[in-house]
């Protein structure tokens, strides 16, 4: 039975949603594109191309954004060091974590932690999450409101 291109595209989208859901659920686990692709019965190249087409970013970029969002929440709590947060969200390298955090948020994690601990007291978590959501593509420095 041959498959139409539209039917194949719908199957790929369903697999991509499962990959995205796995990243959302298991962001703190060691994940790589090869493992995600195996789980979706796709090649790594096909997964990366289709994921980017569907969601506008690579699977790795999406994973790092999820990790940084979670790191921001942990840093706002103020009870963990930057290193502890780095490992809690699944990053193996403090340098990579700090670089990516700074790219997305517009300030280093230590600065964010210091400002957030004092700047969002009494702010509901759901509001803090929206206000402090990472911004992509070097836009953070130009548009990020200060928390303090």
Predicted segments with their positions:
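Alpha-helical bundle regulatory/interaction domains
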Residues: 1-46, 53-54, 58, 70-148
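Short, basic-rich loop-to-helix N-cap that marks the start of a DNA-contacting helix
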Residues: 61-63
